[in-house]
Amino acid sequence: LWGAAIALGFAAALTGGFLLMGCPVSLLPPRDYAAGAVLGTVVLQALIAGAEELFFRGFLPQELEALALPPWLTAAVPALLFGGLHFFMNGNVIQLCISTAIAAYYLLLRRKGAGLVTLAWAHLLHNLIFFYLIGI
């Protein structure tokens, strides 16, 4: 429980810090605002991806496994919650489907031994490609 609280608190503190420093935090792709904000946005996205990986692929599956739930359920719950979170943020059904599928795939990779840092890098790359280049 402490790991999740720390990860979520860290993400919230960083987001608040960026806002207080005047860094634009926007759902708009980088081409829609000053080029200087791109680096700040990439750093923020990296921190968010890391926090999401800690929670959705680290803490949550581990806690569900501790409850002796079936393996399919310990994978389905975090994947559906992750997809639902991303749908709630922008209401995009395509994003819901992609996020849920990616979450399930990352959980599979995690079970096969992938580290959370590796998954956070993959998550960041996914966000940058799909969100900023494609605009989903």
Map each language-model feature to its residues.
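Membrane-interface helix/loop boundary segments of multi-pass membrane proteins
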Residues: 52-77, 108-115
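Hydrophobic alpha-helical transmembrane segments
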Residues: 1-5, 38-42, 72-77, 96-97, ...
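Active-site His/Glu-centered metal-binding helix of metallohydrolases
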Residues: 50-55, 59-60, 84, 88, ...
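Alpha-helical transmembrane segments of multipass membrane proteins
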Residues: 46, 80-87, 104-108, 128
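Small-polar-interrupted transmembrane alpha-helices in polytopic inner-membrane proteins
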Residues: 7-11, 72-86, 103
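Functionally important transmembrane alpha-helices
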Residues: 91-136
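Juxtamembrane helix-loop-helix connectors linking adjacent transmembrane helices
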Residues: 1-49, 66-67
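Membrane-embedded alpha-helical segments of multi-pass membrane proteins
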Residues: 35-39, 43, 51, 55, ...
